[in-house]
Amino acid sequence: MNKFDDKYIRMARIWATNSYCKRRQVGALLVKDKMIISDGYNGTPSGFENECEEGNVTKPYVLHAEANAISKVAKSGNSSEGATLYVTASPCIECSKLIIQAGIRRVVYSDDYRLDDGIQLLRRAGVEVEKVEVE
């Protein structure tokens, strides 16, 4: 753990509060050379209603925080190659595939997702993964 991990993961937790999702709010920050280059939180695509659930089920088109942060940096024309992703929940397998393809070299998270296949895939791809405890 480096001295900035705690600060960035706390910032990701604050960013998660922007999510309209009721079941779980997740925030993500992409950091490169000690600068935040992108951010994201889980929610519906731009232009859609700000409701993530229908009844007690998450709508299938809700984007995860990691996907939002990665697509945002790609849209800006910047590169996430070699960046660190700070995310409040461990990535699912779909987000892990995006993380690998985006060239992100390190993932720091605070809460466990119900499945750990995403973490296993990241490690298999040589991405450094670290869980940090936040009080």
What is each stretch, according to the model?
Residues 1-135:
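Zinc-dependent deaminase catalytic domain
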